């Protein structure tokens, strides 16, 4: 296994007497986008929490460029399924809160880093808005900006677009691809949407079994930047191949 990028080895993870993950070996290359799919309860979100340093009671290790990661690391960002914005802070302060909790809202609005990120997610005019004034898609854009504030090398996302409508989901998917291309970070995404996994990813990994392990991995030889119309046939074929693999594995 190469020492470049993010490496994960999980010999086992238990909750009480129940083993939820076993024999997981996963590497995420610099700039690579990988999706994790699998049935509910197979351990996908637990795997992300281990990588994020939020779950430490497991047998195995996480490493970045060969150096072991212990606990929460500023080089690894995490985007939750829900935006989880602080309701008493405006948009700018929520973005800066990722690393500068003591920064005043006024100072956050003047921060060049905050302004850059809000411009990149299309919310520069919403810097003074409170979370209750945002749509679901706008709130998740703020969460993306907050996740990038520390300039992570790896971004973990746990079903980040599942709570928004289909049109907003498409826009957020394209935004994620654009941000990943501009910033050069790697992405590990948990999703139940096969079309989303195929469109976004360089690889799709299927977690299956009880306890969960890597049941299948499929590399997607599709060019970047992705284009839904120009690559429609290739995306459709990749989806069919993945569905065939899932049916043969009886994962869902």
From Swiss-Prot:
Predominant location category: membrane
Keyword Membrane (UniProt): yes
Domain of life (superkingdom): Bacteria
UniProt entry keywords in alphabetical sequence: ATP-binding, Cell inner membrane, Cell membrane, Membrane, Nucleotide-binding, Translocase, Transport
Molecular function via GO: ATP binding; ATP hydrolysis activity
CDD domains: ABC_NrtD_SsuB_transporters (cd03293)
Localization annotation: Cell inner membrane
Residues that coordinate or bind ATP: 38-45
InterPro entries tied to this protein: AAA+_ATPase (IPR003593), ABC_transporter-like_ATP-bd (IPR003439), ABC_transporter-like_CS (IPR017871), ABC_transporter_ATP-bind (IPR050166), P-loop_NTPase (IPR027417)
Signal peptide: none
EC number(s) on file: 7.6.2.14
Bilayer disposition of the protein: Peripheral membrane protein
Keyword Nucleotide-binding: yes
Domain ABC transporter as annotated: residue spans: 6-234
Family matches, as SMART domains: AAA
Function: Part of the ABC transporter complex SsuABC involved in aliphatic sulfonates import. Responsible for energy coupling to the transport system.
Family named by the database record: Belongs to the ABC transporter superfamily. Aliphatic sulfonates importer (TC 3.A.1.17.2) family.
Subunit text: The complex is composed of two ATP-binding proteins (SsuB), two transmembrane proteins (SsuC) and a solute-binding protein (SsuA).
Protein name: Aliphatic sulfonates import ATP-binding protein SsuB 1
Annotated organism of origin: Xanthomonas axonopodis pv. citri (strain 306)
